[in-house]
Each structure stands twice: as structure tokens, then as C-alpha cells.
Amino acid sequence: MAAPCEGQAFAVGVEKNWGAVVRSPEGTPQKIRQLIDEGIAPEEGGVDAKDTSATSQSVNGSPQAEQPSLESTSKEAFFSRVETFSSLKWAGKPFELSPLVCAKYGWVTVECDMLKCSSCQAFLCASLQPAFDFDRYKQRCAELKKALCTAHEKFCFWPDSPSPDRFGMLPLDEPAILVSEFLDRFQSLCHLDLQLPSLRPEDLKTMCLTEDKISLLLHLLEDELDHRTDERKTTIKLGSDIQVHVTACILSVCGWACSSSLESMQLSLITCSQCMRKVGLWGFQQIESSMTDLDASFGLTSSPIPGLEGRPERLPLVPESPRRMMTRSQDATFSPGSEQAEKSPGPIVSRTRSWDSSSPVDRPEPEAASPTTRTRPVTRSMGTGDTPGLEVPSSPLRKAKRARLCSSSSSDTSSRSFFDPTSQHRDWCPWVNITLGKESRENGGTEPDASAPAEPGWKAVLTILLAHKQSSQPAETDSMSLSEKSRKVFRIFRQWESLCSC
């Protein structure tokens, strides 16, 4: 009885071995693929990563099947490619060869007029030779536009899977996203406080930004802050510093924001989220200096601007530039008594005079300054005949210089210009160009409708924001409305304009 059992067991074993031999050709490619993955895949991926890669390869048949979904659909990766197109490397190109179009197909700049694919590492020379023949120039532009797709390697995914068009467009068809991004930009700009740039009233009139429009936008921001959580609502309060809020509101409408990645650099920089342009505010007139000049010229030191008297004591956020850091240290050496005796208009004006003035009289050396009342070695050397130890509070020459520096020819006014929110963008930026909505793009339109007025992107966003506010405007009003506050700010702008023109 034992022999049949042993025979059956032998037959079963032979059948198993034969089945294994039969199935071995089917399992060999999978085994080889696993061995290859063990040498290429990172160790922290583990077994799950190998199984996922094997599954994607068995289904799609390509190891790069999931790469397009990770890089071409990433908005952060898209704008990181756009950021490589600096003005030195990519200049003088038409709109159809803008960095937004090049980054859509995976290109970055490595040298002047030299593109490189971020995936297949292919190179493309995009130089435009100066030509007097306009047709030849247009032909060259068309060739380069076509080469953005054809210059990739054979198995590169960018020609078949470019980034979405919406990355390089303003979301004009989605008002909720516009309002949310508008509030985020406003909150980030308010962190700069008095370091925000001063705006010229003529530029605001050119942009058709009236007091009523600014008031509606401030009401919209206040309503959106009320809908946010309490943690985010405490960061910004619209009850104080109305001049800062009006400036931040105008800049955020035009697409400017204070990037969070720049806070560690301790610099007052604002950036555009579309053209990735960064602007240092130390090169422009700032609210801090304008308020100081305004108070000194109109005698407003005894009656401060509403909203500033309740400000908590704050440390200076960041020095505007290395030059401002040195001038701040020079101001600390001067005593308040001497400054009051000399009737200085303000610390900002004195800093600018001591550093930027072309006259050698207005350039005191840092080691010559002392905490005590200053002497007059410079005026004595010019022939006044004073003794070195004689202490005088001021001199006629200094008074004359200070009166002249309050005019429009002062170094502070001439060296620092006003910030224009629209002209600081790059010429291909969607904020200053005519932007098509999603419906127009889906219909295949490349030009705006002739019946609709041609408006730049920031003005289209402004129209949508105002319409969104007017559609949901509440009936109740505050005791001191924001429109009244904004009119006070514009009155300050007009006074400052008359100050600069005197």
C-alpha cells in the first residue's frame, strides 16, 4: 500500500516541477526587471516603490510614464523654469517666444539666447539676428516657435505633454480664486509696513484708481478677512495705518506681493507671481520718508495721521539697503538736542543729506560725529574765522542748505523715483498684457474680442473684484467708513505732490 502512495507523490512532484519549468519563461522578464530596479531605485523606496514602478512599466510600457504628471503639471516647477529667464539671458523676444511659452514646453535658459530642456537635456539656440526684412524676421520667429516642440529628443515627453495654458494666465473666469489671491498678496505686503513705496497721484489718475474704487476694494478685503479663521484674521487689522493699507491694496491689484522666501534675506523686496520680477524698494521713495517730509513741511508733527497714534512700538523690519544701514548708524551718533537746535525736518532727510548730497559740507565723516554738540571745523576752514573749540548750534550756511534741500531739487527727490505699479512688470507679463479668458482659449481664439475693450490684466482683475464686491455689498456702514479714510490718504498724496513741486 505504501508503493502507490510513493508513486502518487512522485507524480505530483514531477507535475509541480514541470509547471515551474513551463512558467519560468513568463517570470524571467519580471525577475530581470526587478534586478535592474534594485540597482537603480533608491533604497528608501523599499518594496512598495519597486512594485509601483513595475506596475507602471507593465501597464504603460515606459519608465518615464509618470514623469510628465509630476513635472509638466506642477505649477511650482513651471514658475521655477520661468524664473531662469532673466533680462540678461532673454531679451528682445516677441510675445510668442515669451518665457511663459518656453517654460510651457520644459525649456530653461542656461546662457544668453540658449535654451535647455529640463528633461532630455537638449539644447536650442534661439538667437534672433537683426534683420531689416520684417518677413524674414517673422519667419525666424515662426521657426523658433515650432522648434520649441521639435527640438526635444525622440523620447522626450514635453512635445506631447506640455504644461497647461492656465499656468501663464490670470484666472479671470474664477472670481473666487482672484479674491483669495488678492487677499494673500495684500496680507504679505502689509508686513512691509512703512517700507512700502510711495505712489504718485498722477500714476493713480492714469490708472483710473479713484477714492471710491479703493474704498470698495478695502471693504472687500475687510469682508474676506471676516470669513477667514481667527488665526489669520489677527495678522491684519484694517483699523490702523490706512496709508499702508491703501498702498498695499493698489500694489496687490497690480499683482505685486512680498514673497515669503525673501524674509530670511532681510531685504524689502516685492515680487510678481507671473513674470517673477523682483524689485528692491530701497531704490524708490517710501512711505516712511514721505510721511516724515510731509510732517516737517506742513507742521503735522503735533497732529499725527489718524491710525498712527495707536500703533504698537515696533522694531524696524529690515534696513532698506546697506547704505541705509550705514546712515542709520550715523544718525544714532547725533544728539536730539543738536538736531532740534538745527531745526532738521526729520531723520530721513538728514540721513539723505549727509550721504547723498554732492556738497562736501554735507558729508560729515562717521568718526567726526560725537554725542555732544557739534563744532564747525568745516565752516572755519572755509574762511569764517571761528575757533575750533567754539560751539555754535547752527550756521547761516547750514540753514540755507536745509531750506534749499526742501525744494524739488533735493537729493532725496532726485535720487529716488516713485514706484509705478504697472511699468515695473516685464513687457510679457500677463498683468500688463491683454489676457484671454478660459472660454476664449477653449474656442481657439488668440486675439481679444473686438467688441470688448482691450484691457490689461490688472484692469480686468480690478473690474472683476469691483463687480464681486458690488454684487455682495452690505447695506450697513461703519461709523468711520473706509471711503473717508481713503480720501484722507489721497489728500496726503496731493499735499505731498505740492511739496515735491514747490
From Swiss-Prot:
The modification N-acetylalanine is found at A2. Changing Y105F: Does not strongly affect phosphorylation status. Widely expressed. Highly expressed in heart, skeletal muscle and testis. Expressed in brain, placenta, lung, kidney, liver, pancreas, spleen, thymus, prostate, ovary small intestine and colon. Weakly or not expressed in leukocytes. The modification Phosphoserine is found at residues 24, 58, 62, 321, 329, 335, 338, 344, 354, 359, 370, 381, 395, 407, 483. Residues 52-72, 327-338, 351-360 have a biased composition (Polar residues). The modification Phosphothreonine is found at T28, T84, T333, T384, T387. GO terms for biological process: cell division; protein ubiquitination. A motif (Nuclear localization signal) lies at residues 396-402. Interacts with TPR; this interaction mediates ZC3HC1 nuclear envelopes (NE)-association but also required for proper positioning of a substantial amount of TPR at the nuclear basket (NB). This is Zinc finger C3HC-type protein 1. It comes from Homo sapiens (Human). The gene is ZC3HC1.
